[in-house]
Amino acid sequence: MTMVQSLWRKRASAALEEFRITLPQYLLIQLARRRGAIRPSEAAEELASDRPTLTLVARKCVARGWLSRLRVKLDRRSHLLRLTGLGEELLDRIEAARVLGPEALGDPLDVLDSEERAQFLRALDKVHRRARDLF
């Protein structure tokens, strides 16, 4: 699966170049859209990123105006990341261009018939649950 992920990330990164956004930046602002305001530590965990890397990505997103930082009232050292209107507009443009869907990037599972696909997805789900238990 790592090889498939690597190939997908490479194609997705190339598709995002015209929008002047990196894949990690896109994933972070997409997460902020889904979750609303989110702590950087939670974002790092959800995106399987280390905190220093996520911090750099977040700073760039804030500098570009796609995210804003909100101070947490009870803990002034802590902050949340929230999608801005500019970030929302960027996501809308990317989605409208349909550059990240299977029709643009391809679907590696299209070589499987429906039964094979169902078996594969069940097996993948089983491996995913086991990995969660282990890690």
Question: How should these model regions be labeled?
Answer:
Residues 2-5, 30-34, 95, 125:
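Short, locally clustered residues in the helix-turn-helix/winged-helix DNA-binding domain
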Residues 59-122:
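Charged, amphipathic alpha-helical coiled-coil/dimerization segments
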Residues 34, 85, 132:
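Short, conserved catalytic or interaction motifs in soluble domains
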Residues 40-41, 52, 59, 79:
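Residues within helix-turn-helix
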Residues 6-50:
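N-terminal helix-turn-helix DNA-binding core of bacterial DNA-binding proteins
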Residues 129-135:
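Short, charged, intrinsically disordered terminal tails
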